[in-house]
Curated annotation (Swiss-Prot):
One cellular-component annotation, GO: ciliary transition zone
Chain residue ranges for the region called Disordered: 1-46
Lineage summary: Eukaryota, Metazoa, Chordata, Craniata, Vertebrata
Transmembrane segments: none
This protein's UniProt keywords: Cell projection, Cilium, Cilium biogenesis/degradation, Lipid-binding, Protein transport, Transport
Entry remark concerning the domains of this protein: Adopts an immunoglobulin-like beta-sandwich fold forming a hydrophobic cavity that capture N-terminally myristoylated target peptides. Phe residues within the hydrophobic beta sandwich are required for myristate binding.
General function of this protein: Myristoyl-binding protein that acts as a cargo adapter: specifically binds the myristoyl moiety of a subset of N-terminally myristoylated proteins and is required for their localization. Plays a key role in localization of proteins to the primary cilium membrane.
Protein's name according to its UniProt entry: Protein unc-119 homolog B-B
Coiled-coil regions listed: none
Residues the record lists as binding tetradecanoate: 132
Similarity comment: Belongs to the PDE6D/unc-119 family.
Subcellular location(s) of the protein: Cell projection, Cilium
GO terms, molecular function: lipid binding
Pfam families per the UniProt record, alphabetical: GMP_PDE_delta
Organism listed in the record: Xenopus laevis (African clawed frog)
């Protein structure tokens, strides 16, 4: 999940108390597939290839379109107003599943602070991009959990799905595919994505550490197989050096 840079150090209270809790239990979701050269599952010969320029000319994008991209996108493939379901990500936490150590946590600002910041906000991409910095040790983790909390507007959300693709210098490292399932209207939902990272070569770890923010990702969100949200992130692995 991605969010704006201004969210990274803030932990606000829930902004809409009428949101239903969604059951109070964290759903743990495992990716349906993992792709990437380092994982040994790089054979994607059955996937139709697409260029970003081709997709920008389409009125509706589906999962097979973004799965056919071979490099990170330069543009956002949908507009903020395409999120007609009012889906809003409010909290995000990354932890090492083997030790339970929290590696990163952000929360959306409370309503008052958000309104104040929006009054001076000029960047159309704000809210759709986040920059991460980790230590080199992060690249050696094998299992990571990403807990996300999000709210839903007045419409039911059918078949909510996320496809997240990670690249280093436009070389795809891994592709994750998660199903959130059905979300009831006016609900607050929490789930933990369970990432199983491929083992990276020592040379690739060195390059990714020495070249901060050249590792990037696209996160595509679909409802009923139609793209409604597109977030971006970049990563540095030189923290603590």
């Amino acid at each position: 999940m991605s969010g704006s840079n201004r969210e990274a150090a803030l932990a606000g209270q829930p902004k809409d108390e009428r949101k239903k809790s969604g059951g109070g239990v964290i759903n743990r979701l495992k990716a349906r597939r993992v792709q990437g050269k380092e994982s040994g599952t790089s054979d994607q010969s059955s996937i139709t290839r697409f260029r970003e320029e081709e997709l920008l000319g389409l009125n509706e994008l589906r999962p097979e379109h973004v799965l056919g991209l071979s490099r990170v996108t330069d543009n956002y493939l949908c507009k903020p107003e395409d999120n007609i379901f009012g889906i809003d990500f409010t909290r995000f936490k990354i932890r090492d599943l083997e030790t339970g150590t929290v590696l990163f946590e952000i929360s959306k600002p409370c309503s008052e602070q958000e309104e104040e910041e929006e009054s001076t906000h000029l960047d159309a991409s704000a809210g759709r991009f986040v920059r991460y910095q980790f230590t080199p040790a992060f690249l050696r983790l094998r299992k990571v959990g990403a807990t996300v909390e999000f709210t839903v507007g007045d419409k039911p959300v059918k078949s909510f799905r996320m496809i997240e693709r990670h690249y280093f210098r436009d070389r795809i490292l891994k592709s994750f595919d998660f199903d959130f399932g059905f979300c009831i209207p006016n609900s607050r939902n929490t789930c933990e994505h369970m990432y199983e990272f491929p083992q990276l070569s020592e040379e690739l770890i060195r390059l990714m550490t020495e070249n901060p923010y050249e590792t990037r990702s696209d996160s595509f969100y679909f409802v009923d197989n139609k793209l409604i949200m597109h977030n971006k992130a970049d990563y540095a692995y030189n923290g603590g050096q």
